[in-house]
Amino acid sequence: MINPFQRNLDSLGNYFSYPIIRFITGILLIPHGYGKLEKGWNGNLDGFISFLDKEFSNPLFTGFFLAYLIAFTEFLGGICIAFGFFTRIAAFSVTIFMAFAVLYHLPHGFFWSKEGYEYPLMWGVITFAIFLRGSGEMSIDKRFR
């Protein structure tokens, strides 16, 4: 038999758990994007652009374009995910970016402390789950449905 406290906790958990996960995920993405917009990667925007030119050089996407695409994806995607605005588009965009980050870090092994793919994999799985679930009840998207 479920006691009243457990029933109330289940009800609260069912209502608030997903918005909390979505909000915190978005909030934690924002500084990653903002940091890249402000200073690039490791505090050096020119170095970040040069790194992207060297690693991902192709005629379609320059390092400059990729640097800002990555930064805006994390920054604006984080804001959208946090507040549930264009949630699926934002989460899918971050998921795609993280899939490329996983592929880049794959040769370094699993652990992030050795530049492995652990951290981008975690972000990718969480944002993919958000993409699948959508914005949920407590979101800006819900207000426009």
Label the model's feature ranges.
Residues 1-42, 60-72, 76, 83-145:
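Extended, low-polarity transmembrane helix blocks
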Residues 44-61:
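Perimembrane loop-to-helix junctions flanking transmembrane segments
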